[in-house]
Design a protein with these regions (language model features):
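Residues forming the flavin
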Residues: 1-192
């Protein structure tokens, strides 16, 4: 049982396959992208299971990551049981009612060895907290000024350190703004 982000790191960076038969809980973009990635790496993604009656991911990712690979998306469903000894062997999924509670008698059993959790992200804030940078309680990320400088003079933040981004396009623009401001800061010779 891994987060989709951890699986992404293992597969993309470390070159380790995390499973052969996979069920993904949550249909956010990272979960959808990992469904495709796991399939391309040779795994069989049995299902993408979403508690809500709609996907949390972009429509293009649903098409390109699930539909194109015949991976079923179970909306208004959740995992109700995970079985196995020493590792995952089976996942039980059930439909949920309007109250988001499992509906008895709707269980589906999946023979699998891996569960990926894609159920919400928080910003990467370990270094932010260590540096005693002011945090935004709404986003759990660093508070930044318009130029992306944090509450600590000379420290700039962008991307998932500030808040979780859905599209890399937004991270690119933000990182360019932060990089330019950091360079201007260094060149100005300002010091506290």
């Amino acid at each position: 049982i891994l987060t989709a982000g951890a699986a992404q790191r293992y597969v993309n960076i470390e070159g380790h396959m995390v499973g052969k038969r996979v069920v993904i809980l949550g249909s956010g973009d990272i979960g959808l992208i990992m469904a495709r990635r796991m399939t391309l790496e040779g795994a069989k993604v049995l299902a993408c299971v979403e508690l809500m009656p709609y996907s949390g991911g972009l429509q293009r990712n649903i098409v390109q990551c699930l539909n194109d690979f015949d991976i079923p998306l179970y909306l208004s469903h959740t995992i109700v049981d995970i079985k196995g000894k020493n590792r995952v062997e089976e996942v039980v999924v059930a439909e949920v009612g309007a109250d988001r509670k499992p509906v008895p008698g709707t269980e589906i059993h999946f023979d699998c060895d891996t569960v990926l959790l894609s159920v919400g992200l928080i910003p990467e804030n370990e270094l932010t907290r260590t540096a005693d940078i002011k945090m935004d309680p709404r986003t759990n990320g660093a508070v930044v000024y318009e130029n992306m400088e944090t509450s600590c003079s000379g420290i700039f933040a962008c991307g998932n350190v500030v808040h979780v981004h859905d599209l890399v396009d937004f991270v690119t623009a933000e990182s360019q703004r932060a990089g330019k401001a950091a360079a201007e800061y260094v060149l100005s010779g300002e010091k506290d």
